[in-house]
A protein has these predicted regions:
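Flexible loop/hinge segments that line or gate small-molecule binding clefts
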Residues: 109-134, 251-258
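Hinge/cleft segment of the Venus flytrap/periplasmic-binding protein
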Residues: 275-335
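An alpha-beta-alpha
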Residues: 53, 138-187, 287-310
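Extracytoplasmic "Venus flytrap"
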Residues: 31-52, 56, 60, 67-73, ...
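Bacterial signal peptide processing site
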Residues: 19-21
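Periplasmic-binding protein-like
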Residues: 33-34, 88-99, 119, 216-228, ...
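Hydrophobic alpha-helical segments within soluble ligand-binding/sensing domains
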Residues: 130-152, 265-283
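C-terminal motif of bacterial Sec signal peptides marking the signal peptidase cleavage site
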Residues: 15-17
Length: 335
């Protein structure tokens, strides 16, 4: 998959650039990052986050970077306790780059000489910082732009707040402008659903066969994937089936296939992280909590201008429904 391959190739290059060059004395700035337990290289959430962090470190070689991938939540908890208890003399920052780490941060006291940021959570952690990039507006817009398709919301699991918000946004946007149906599939019962590439392929193969045989089915399919690291399994299946379409997710995947991907919902965590890290370097305190939505630069829906299925103009649909999606997101936030 091209969108995955590009980022996967860039990460080692950026990583090689961090920490290189002559250093006369140890840096007093230390940046530690716990990436998600599903790692990187899937072309989605973790990759965009990691790309931003490595780019920042390349621009600021005086910052010492410790990039860690805990084996599981329990391992992450031990690493967090060790970091919080360190008696370092420099300026330290820790980024918990997944909302699956909420449980290990909750109730922890602030470190004496550092700061902690956890990504993609709407919870507040006293003494620490958090932010969330809201997907409701972008998902509503995606649903409206999918008006000519039968929609399938494909979730990695049930009960994840960010996934449920996106699913609700897509469903509401689609139903507001379309007579086609929206279905929901769920891959797994827990977080393991975010790292099941092979199982995703088999699941979709079986479900679509059943779907096409259903008497109630009529129309062209479009997947709205909320799968994390399992997303490549869906792309693997769609690569060989020209009658199924898929929304790009997290990064711009429109180059995957102009006949398959009508648009991409892009989450620009690298831009949000750059803002936080630059504030850290300048000594500016981090807010306790921040939220960003469709009107910010941190989430956007990118139309595939090459998409030519039945002469659908994704750019025109984006322009038609964008303002309405912004208003719907504000209404949702006020609920």
């Amino acid at each position: 998959m091209r969108c995955r391959a590009i980022i996967s190739l860039l990460i080692p290059v950026l990583l090689a650039g961090c920490g290189k060059g002559p250093v006369s004395e140890p840096s007093s700035r230390e940046l530690t990052v716990f990436i998600g337990t599903d790692g990187y290289g899937d072309g989605s959430y973790n990759d965009t986050m990691l790309y931003g962090i490595l780019g920042f470190c390349k621009d600021h070689p005086d910052v010492n970077l410790s990039l860690q991938q805990p084996e599981n939540i329990a391992d992450a908890g031990k690493r967090l306790d060790a970091w919080l208890s360190e008696e370092g003399s420099g300026d330290r920052a820790l980024i918990l780059a997944s909302n699956t780490y909420e449980e290990i941060l909750r109730g922890k006291s602030a470190p004496k000489n550092g700061r902690v940021l956890i990504l993609e959570t709407d919870d507040v952690f006293p003494g620490h910082s958090s932010y969330i990039i809201r997907r409701y507006g972008a998902s509503w817009l995606s649903g409206a732009m999918s008006r000519y398709f039968v929609g399938i919301i494909f979730k990695a699991m049930d009960g994840n707040d960010m996934i449920e918000e996106s699913a609700r946004g897509f469903s509401n946007g689609h139903s507001a402008v379309s007579d086609q149906k929206v279905y929901t599939w769920t891959l797994a019962n827990g977080p393991e659903g975010f790292a099941m590439r092979d199982s995703t392929y088999r699941y979709v193969y079986k479900k679509t066969e059943e779907f096409y045989e259903s008497e109630e089915f009529f129309g062209d399919l479009l997947f709205f994937p909320l799968l994390g690291g399992s997303l490549p399994g869906l792309f693997d299946y769609c690569r060989y089936n020209g009658f199924i379409h898929i929304a790009g997710m997290d990064v711009d995947c429109t180059a995957f296939n102009p006949l398959v991907v009508p648009y991409s919902l892009c989450v620009n965590n690298h831009l949000a992280l750059k803002m936080y890290l630059e504030d850290w370097l300048s000594g500016k305190p981090w807010p306790e909590h921040m939220e960003f939505g469709l009107e910010s630069e941190y989430v956007q829906v990118v139309p595939n201008r090459q998409f030519s299925f039945e002469n659908q103009d994704m750019a025109a649909l984006h322009e038609e429904y964008y303002s309405r999606a912004v208003e719907k997101e504000k209404e949702y936030a006020a609920e």
